[in-house]
């Protein structure tokens, strides 16, 4: 079932090694192809050789327009968050449906820690004026989470160069 795949995959995702990364990518690709009708239709349209894809670099990426015109989900779930693009092109914004914010936060936090260290060790400054003025930004969500986990007293958002928001 989709639920058992998600549970098993999540556990392995956060304990994976560099050696198992490619295998996890291919497994997730196969899952998305089987359980996301929009992604499957796109792969079929471009004649992606599904059974021959063995390396993560060969996995087809959906064009950004698909995120604007379709509700991209694998299976059925109520999203805990729906992030949207800034719409800088003046067109419809793209949307990202997040089923589980705990997994989402763990993912970007562990990614940060892999390269830098724990956010507690940093002063996190968010100077993102055009983003602060809109709702639904995944960047604001991630920076806010990093600020909350930082132990530095001057961490925070700044609307303009010196104004703390």
Per-segment meaning from a language model:
Residues 27, 124, 131-165:
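Conserved adenylate-forming
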